[in-house]
Swiss-Prot record:
One of its GO terms (biological process) is RNA splicing. The lineage of its organism: Eukaryota, Viridiplantae, Streptophyta, Embryophyta, Tracheophyta. It is found in: Plastid, Chloroplast. InterPro entries: Domain_X, Maturase_MatK, Maturase_MatK_N. HAMAP family: MatK (MF_01390). Transmembrane segments: none annotated. GO terms for cellular component: chloroplast. One of its GO terms (molecular function) is RNA binding. It comes from Vaccinium vitis-idaea (Mountain cranberry). This is Maturase K. Its main location: plastid.
């Protein structure tokens, strides 16, 4: 009970004052000297980024304030004949300044939490995002997975309300709320899409901070409840009511009615949770009944804690042995790999059948064709289309663009054992290339091939991508043999929307 109270109690020493540094921008550097932010943080840490030192920060803000004053004077003058009136210029300046202010203490808090913790370094990286090793090791023992789209706040007020438990001066929140309501495009700050959320390009840094802080806040509570799920039978439910009061006034009877019948069955110690680009995956080795209870618990959790309505139909539960879930651009599943072992006992021999689980990844052809269709490379059925907008480009630029697209897709999906679907993508891009060049030169496909040379196109667009391997030495092996592990191609800094289907 005391452990819960210590966790659920809001630490007042971590609340921050933001209004004064925001108004007096010249003295924002004093924020780092405010010992009330978090007494456990040593602000003069030598490991702290030198670029954020007090003197440099003060000079930077002073110079920015002078430049901002000149820009504001120019913006407040007559109408710009090229751009017109800049109605949200002041709001953009305020949002950027507020983002800088609020990020400083949370960054310092992050440094404090990392002190004394050793960061585990993986010497066997197997994916572009370094997530497949955890998925292969943890999801291989799971039986069911629930794919849920992260709930988004319907209004910016919900995002601001989450900050009020960390900001102790109401003036900052009122000022922030005022600028949000006065913002010209406040209705398009967060636009819900199919599985993710797109932020306005302007002030993106600040709204990303609000959204990420909101998500991390409910995830921290969710992880805490999940870690204590195996003990819920012997714990009074009133202890969780204390944390709810920080977010919404809820009567005890309502809380018991909504949650008591759900929480007591959560005794699964093998529940895994991962989130990426607005999509969350919960994997468990429990039954479908258990996952259904987690599903409706999440719906009630978001609704009662954060006043967010999450549609239950957007949470899909699949058996990993029979279905695949879309994550990181792959269709992932857990397949049974049968094996036969022969044993000899004195005069008799036996054949023992054994089936082991293996994490398998497939290339999703349907979402890839949908992305190519969205980019006007083909139609919804996968039939190639000519890119008439590329007629102004040179032949080498057209070949380079299409070749780079295919190379990125081939490299990204090189970690999959079954890459037959890439042959269809290769065919679409090959016909697209030839058709675009023929349309540009107003000729036939044969004339284009004769002019450029069949060998160039065949060598460039049909070259088979090699699967990359690394050889590691297994330390635990007594014979010191070498073994091979498949890895994903890592030399990609940007993957187009064709690989990100969320």
């Amino acid at each position: 009970m005391e452990e819960f109270k210590r966790y659920l109690e809001l630490d007042r020493s971590q609340q921050h004052d933001f209004i004064y540094p925001l108004i007096f921008q010249e003295y924002i550097y004093a924020l780092a000297h405010d010992r009330g932010l978090n007494r456990s943080i040593v602000f003069e840490n030598r490991d702290y980024d030198n670029k954020s030192s007090l003197l440099i920060r003060k000079r930077l803000i002073t110079x920015x304030x002078x430049x901002x004053x000149x820009x504001x004077x120019x913006x407040x003058x007559x109408k710009n004949k090229f751009l017109g009136y800049n109605t949200n210029f002041d709001s953009q300046m305020i949002f950027e300044g507020f983002a800088v202010v609020v990020e400083i203490p949370f960054y310092l808090q992050l440094l404090s939490s990392l002190e004394g913790k050793e960061i585990v370094k993986s010497h066997n990286l197997r994916s572009l995002h370094s997530i497949f090793p955890x998925x292969x090791x943890x999801x291989x023992x799971x039986x069911x997975x629930x794919x849920x789209x992260x709930x988004x706040x319907x209004x910016m007020e919900i995002l601001v309300r989450t900050l009020r438990y960390w900001v102790k001066d109401p003036s900052s929140l009122h000022l922030l709320r005022f600028f949000l309501h006065e913002y010209p495009n406040r209705n398009s700050l967060i636009t819900p899409k199919k599985y993710s959320f797109s932020f306005s390009k302007r002030n993106q840094k600040f709204f990303l901070f609000l959204y990420n802080f909101h998500v991390c806040e409910y995830e921290s509570i969710f992880v805490f409840l999940r870690n204590q799920s195996s003990h819920l039978c012997s714990i009074s439910f009133e202890t969780f009511l204390e944390r709810i009061l920080f977010y919404k006034k809820i009567e005890l009877e309502v809380f018991v009615k909504d949650f008591k019948g759900i929480l007591w069955v959560f005794k699964d110690p093998f529940l895994h949770y991962v989130r990426y680009r607005g999509k969350s995956i919960l994997a468990s080795n429990g039954s479908s009944l258990l996952m259904n209870k987690w599903k409706y618990y999440l719906v009630n959790f978001w609704e009662c804690y954060f006043s967010i309505w999450a549609q239950p139909r957007r949470i899909h539960i699949n058996q990993l042995s029979n279905n695949s879930f879309d994550f990181l651009g792959y269709l992932s599943s857990v397949r049974l790999k049968p094996s036969m072992v022969r044993t000899q006992m004195i005069e008799n021999s036996f054949l023992i059948e054994n089936a082991s689980k293996k994490f398998d990844t497939l290339v999703p052809i349907t979402p890839m064709i949908a992305s190519l269709s969205k980019a006007k490379f083909c139609n919804v059925l996968g039939h190639p289309m000519n890119k008439x907008v590329w007629d102004g480009l040179s032949d080498s630029d057209i070949i380079e663009r299409i070749g780079r697209l295919y190379x990125n897709l081939s490299h990204y999906y090189s970690g999959s054992l079954k890459k037959m679907n890439l042959x269809r993508i290769k065919f679409i891009l090959r016909i697209l290339l030839c058709g675009t060049l023929a349309s540009k030169h107003k000729g036939t496909l044969r004339s284009v091939l004769n002019r450029l040379g069949v060998g160039l196109l065949v060598e460039f667009i049909t070259e088979e991508e090699q699967v990359f391997y690394l050889t590691f030495q297994k330390a635990s092996s007594t014979s010191r043999k070498l073994y091979q592990r498949r890895i994903w191609y890592l030399d990609i800094f940007c993957v187009n929307d064709t690989a990100n289907h969320e």
